Structure formats: C-alpha cells, structure tokens
Curated annotation (Swiss-Prot):
Residues 228-264 have a biased composition (Low complexity). This is Probable circularly permuted 1,3-beta-glucanase P23A10.11c YJL171C. Keywords: Cell wall biogenesis/degradation, Glycoprotein, Glycosidase, Hydrolase, Secreted, Signal. It catalyses: Hydrolysis of (1->3)-beta-D-glucosidic linkages in (1->3)-beta-D-glucans. Residues 1-22 form the signal peptide. One of its GO terms (molecular function) is 1,3-beta-D-glucan synthase activity. The conserved ExDxxE motif might be important for catalytic activity. It comes from the Eukaryota. It comes from Schizosaccharomyces pombe (strain 972 / ATCC 24843) (Fission yeast). It is found in: Secreted. It holds the Pfam family YJL171C_Tos1_C.
Length: 507
C-alpha cells in the first residue's frame, strides 16, 4: 500500500502552477502537514468503473488470472466488503461496527456478490511501486451560504470564480509536465475541487435535516486560479485551506450522515473489548499462513491469511481473541466478521480462513493508543489503521500486483496513518480509481491531520453514508462515547463538528 494523497491527474497539472507556500503548513520528513483536525469529511465518494477481480492463483507457475468486474453507485467501491487492518505500535482497546438496521446487518453481507501525489516513502504497507510526485499547490476556502429552505444559486462572485476556474483548467490542460515539475514550490497537500458548489443538491440534503437552516459549504479552489484580488486582500477575504477551522462547514450541513438510517437506531453488529476479553462477531486474522495450523504458505505467494494468536503477532490453528496487549512496530493484524465465506465471497486463495468483511452503510468505532516503540528496524514507530477491499487480503495483500485487485482500484482507505518514524500526526487517504484513468491512481487525501494518541486512548468514529456519498472520520474522544449496543440518529449527529476538513473527490 502506498501512503500518499491522491487527486485527479488532470488537476495535478493545473494546480502545480502555484508556487506559493500555504500559510500554516510545514514539511516533516518530506511530507506536508497543515492543521490539526477533529473531523475529516470525504464527499462525492462513488465511481463507476471496473477493476480486475482475481479468479485463480496458480502455485506452480506463480501466476494469477483475473476478469474485469464492474462497480458503481454511491461510495463505490467503498460500499463493498472491507476488512480493517492495524499496524503497530498499537494497543486496540475497543472496536465496534454498527449498521442502520440491526436485523439486516449480517444478511446484507450474504446478498453481496461479493494527483499530484505526496512524496513516496520507503515504508509501504504494500510492496507495489507507484510513480509519485510531490504535491505543490496552495488552496483557499471559498465559502458561500446555502439556505436549506430553497435551492438558491451561488453568489455572482462565486459563479464568476467557478467560470474562471473552468477557463483556467482548459487553458492549462495542454501544459508540459516537464515545465511544471521545474517551476513548482512545495505547499499544501489536499484534494481539491475546481467547480462551483452544487447548491441544488446541497440545499436538498440540508433541508432534509434542518428546515430553514443556514449553513456554509466550502469549495476548495487552487490559489493560482484566484487572481482577481491582490494577495493581501485575498488573504483577508479568502482564508487559506490550511485554516479549515476558520472556514467552517456547520454541523447541520454534515448531519445528513444520519440519512443512511433515517430515524432508526444504529445497531451494533460486531464488538471487541480488550479489558474484558469480549469478542462478538469478530475474527482476528494476520498474515502468518502455514506457520501454526491455519492458512497456507507457498514459494509463489508467501504466507497467506491465518488465524491470529491472542498476541496478534503469531499464527493460530483456530480463532482467538486479541489480548489487551501492545502490538509492536511493523506487526499487523486484521478484523473481520465471524461469518465464513460459503461460495459467496468470490475467489480466494484455497486453504485460507476466509471470512466476510464489513459492507455498505455503517458506523465504525475504535479506541486505541499508539505509543512510541523502537522494536523494529522496518516500519519503526509508524502505526496505522486502514481498511482494504476484502478481496485483497483473501488473495494477496503483499507481493505480485497481478494477484490482487489493488492496483486496478478496488479500494483502500487509510484512516489513521503515521507516515514517518516517530511522527505524531495521522492522516487519512482514499485510494481508488475515482478521478484517474490509471487504475489506483485516483482517490483523495488530506494534509490536515489527527493527533496521534501516544499516552492516552483516542476514540475514532468512521461513518460510511451511502445516501450522501460521504465518509466521515471524527475524533469523538471527548463525546462520552461508550460503545453502546445502539445509537440513535441524533446521537451520531451530535458527534459531527463544525469546521471539519472537507475533501471532495472529483467526479
């Protein structure tokens, strides 16, 4: 897995023209970080395309076969089954998955047939090598009021700005990439939107939650395109994207997350608690296949998935509950449902413990600590929490790129990832084909970051909202979240925060 932020390849060229360093951003070990965030919202998530679904893995020839699989719709392909992965140093305290309708939580699984880039670093969670270049543009937040009781049109100034953007993009589209690379200066890394706010859809969404409410919707615009005002006045009237907290999107505009469940409660489907040793509808796996009675090993594909021992590190012959333990640097384990595949998971490597992942609209809660640790020379002190299209680990997570769907864009979501040794900033990134014509080269990421919890635990919430095509990552540590068996829509709405960092994927 490559740890970097992606945006649409066409916009990469356009945004690279800006050579102005964004205020508030700083470079650390080759990466650019801006503001600490309490919430990051990925919007406009969902794409129609194909990826290569693996159909066979041959241990005699070390080759794999695949066939194109179509996908599409809101959140696609991130609405498919995904597994959750954890790399040390990490102490996982609690983990839970909720669905809008408890009675349908597991049955829905059986129904499924189922950029400029940031600088690449050597510590990949995957072995695939992807060409990458440093992101080098500044963005500003252009804020327009949207009224929930009417589908108002953008202000004239915004409409003009949007028109200027489109004209600028068209004029830049034939630019030489060599000239771009030679003329840029490192600035903010963020996914950006070069379009006007869709006020019709925004108003309809907001009004479904709050009648006659006023909120603000922010459009991220490359600074190289906004040239009408002098630098001083621009900095006063259009704050830089590195000041997301001051360019707020109100909670009412994001509270549509509850639209996935309507007025229903979120019901808990899976739960783990380290202190009590409780585990319900959860299976812990790792990549130690063939070493302790589960999974397989081959010279072609190495160690497959296996049951994880209670220490999270070793293999086991049967399912075990993860202990209340620190998993050291560079060690990984994953979480799945306890529902075994029964000719309903597609192809997977024969001999592995094959389980369903988590799909569709859902709420994921996780409590964890990421203390510093120097026990490994590789991936030292670089913890991460991420999710993968479940087909990837069930075939080949690390190794021959032709033996998983990863490179063709079936989906990876880095939720809380530390990019360099000892760093205390965690960033989120979506990896997929959306916004790219080249396999997994699309997606989006944010250089606004979450603070790494090194001494006390953090509780993170991830909401997958199929109704609004949004994925929300929220730090709910101070929200008195206790991993209850159910949550009401209003409970979840209360977690959403104003001033969230908004990352909108290109269509």
């Amino acid at each position: 897995m490559i740890a970097k932020s992606f945006i649409a390849s066409f916009l990469f060229l356009c945004f690279a023209f800006s050579g102005v360093k964004a205020d508030g951003c700083s470079e650390e070990n080759g990466y650019y970080y801006c503001n600490q965030a309490s919430e990051v919202e990925f919007t406009n998530v969902g794409y129609s395309s194909t990826y290569n679904e693996i159909t066979n893995m041959d241990t005699s020839s070390c080759s794999c076969s695949s066939t194109p699989k179509s996908y599409g719709g809101n959140l696609a392909p991130f609405d498919e089954e995904f597994s959750f992965h954890f790399r040390g140093p990490i102490e996982l305290k609690r983990f839970a998955v909720y669905y809008p309708d408890t009675s349908n939580a597991l049955s829905s699984l059986r129904k499924r047939s189922n950029n400029q880039h940031m600088k690449r670093h050597p510590h990949h969670k995957r072995d695939d090598v992807i060409d990458s270049t440093l992101t080098v543009y500044e963005t500003v937040m252009y804020t327009t009021a949207v009224y929930g009781d009417s589908a108002t049109t953008p202000a004239a100034s915004e409409a003009q700005a949007s028109s200027d953007i489109l004209s600028s993009l068209a004029s830049l589209s034939s630019a030489s990439t060599d000239n771009l690379a030679a003329s840029v200066t490192p600035t903010t890394v963020a996914a950006s939107v070069a379009s006007s706010v869709d006020t019709d859809s925004a108003s309809a969404t907001i009004s479904s939650v709050v009648d006659s409410a006023t909120s603000s919707v922010s459009t991220v615009i490359p600074s190289s395109i906004i040239s009408a005002a002098p630098p001083d006045s621009a900095s006063e009237s259009t704050p830089a994207s590195t000041s997301y907290a001051s360019s707020t999107t109100s909670a009412t505009s994001t509270s549509t997350t509850s639209g996935s469940s309507g007025s229903s409660d979120w019901g808990r489907s899976s739960f783990y608690e380290a202190d009590s040793g409780t585990s319900d509808n959860i299976v812990f796996l790792n990549n130690m296949g063939g070493s302790a009675g589960s999974g397989v090993w081959s010279s072609c594909f190495g160690n497959s998935l296996s049951f994880a021992a209670s220490n999270g590190v070793d293999g086991a012959s049967s399912s075990q509950v993860l202990e209340n333990i620190l998993v050291a640097s560079d060690k990984e384990f994953s979480i799945w449902t306890a529902t075994e595949c029964n000719n309903d998971c597609g192809y997977y490597l024969p001999g592995i413990p094959a389980y369903h992942g988590f799909s569709g609209a859902k709420l994921v809660l996780m409590e964890f600590i990421m203390p510093h640790d120097s026990s490994s020379s590789y991936n030292q002190d670089m913890p991460a929490i991420w999710s993968l299209n479940a087909q990837i680990p069930r075939t080949l997570q690390y190794g021959n790129a032709d033996c998983s769907c990863w490179t063709t864009g079936c989906g990876e979501f880095d939720i809380f990832e530390v990019l360099s040794t000892g760093n205390e900033k965690m960033i989120p990134t979506l990896h997929g084909s959306q916004g790219s014509s080249n396999g997994n080269g699309g997606g989006a990421g944010s250089s606004d970051y979450f603070a790494r919890p090194t001494s006390s635990s953090m509780i993170g919430a991830v909401i997958y909202d199929t109704s609004s095509s949004g994925i929300y990552i929220i730090d709910v540590t101070d929200q008195n979240v206790s991993f209850d068996s159910t949550y009401s829509a209003s409970d979840v709405d209360a977690w959403l925060q104003s001033g969230a960092t908004i990352v909108q994927l290109s269509s």
